[in-house]
Amino acid sequence: MAIIVKGEITISKGFNHWKEMIFSQKEKMAEIGMQLLFAGTTKEDPTKLISIIKFDSVEAMQAFGSDKEFTETRRQAGMVMESGVMTPISDEFLTNFPEPFIQH
């Protein structure tokens, strides 16, 4: 069963640096079983990154959390790991209504 999570974390090297790291980790994310549905910084604070992540399963979410190499890659990209908060979303949600908005 898929799990959707809202993530909030501080980034110290800017969104574009973070985005380059994410693009370079496409294979790792597929291996773990995760998909980034949304990510962006808040207008008031460009160091506050908000993300919506879909994990294929509880095991995929656990694999993400325990992957030391991926954690270090994210840390090197400016993610302040100690500031991270992940909040599971309930099974009641709506996406892409009335149509998807996509920007890379």
Where on the chain are the PLM-derived regions?
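Short S/T/G/P-rich N-terminal loop/turn motif that feeds into the first structured element of a domain
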Residues: 1-71, 76, 80-104
